[in-house]
Amino acid sequence: EAARLLGSAPIDVLCFGGTSASFLHGTSYDVALTKKLTGWAPGPKITTASTATLAALAAVKAGTVALATPYVDGVHARAIRFLEENGHKVVSSRNLGIDTDQALAEVPLEKIYDMVREIDTPEASAVFISCTNFKSVGAIEALETAIGKPVVSAIQASFWHSLKIAGVKGAKPGYGSLFAGMEAHAPGGSS
């Protein structure tokens, strides 16, 4: 119902923001979900958090990944399966075992930072932080500086992909290497 209502609104992009809800049943489910949303809301371009994640990992040329999630074991295992069925070997991972949405949103940024530092390995070409309710964006630039590789989060990827498919430039620095080249510049070349 929400997709139908939004489909008639003057919007350019509709992003289904549930990361685990879009990957839980695999890639074919994510594709079917996108088609269903397109049918319900034929006006805007459609993406999902999982589709956006795959596009973001491709953009940063991630092959092998280290995975950080707040999920319980079963959902974490499905996140690994989703990434691997889409060509991203998971070489290291950790999950927090959280099972409520409110608790997901209450994880301190420092804990997410420490978690990523723990799972990073030389074999990983990038780190992926799953869950759009896992507030990780504020740590991305510091993590990339510390570990020297791209860090992609589900919420960051969703925002980036929504801007990309809408053809929008204008991201401000601070969202990680995924946004390189998307900054808007004032006439004359200054920011």
Regions found by a protein language model. Name each.
Residues 1-190:
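Non-catalytic structural scaffold of enzyme domains
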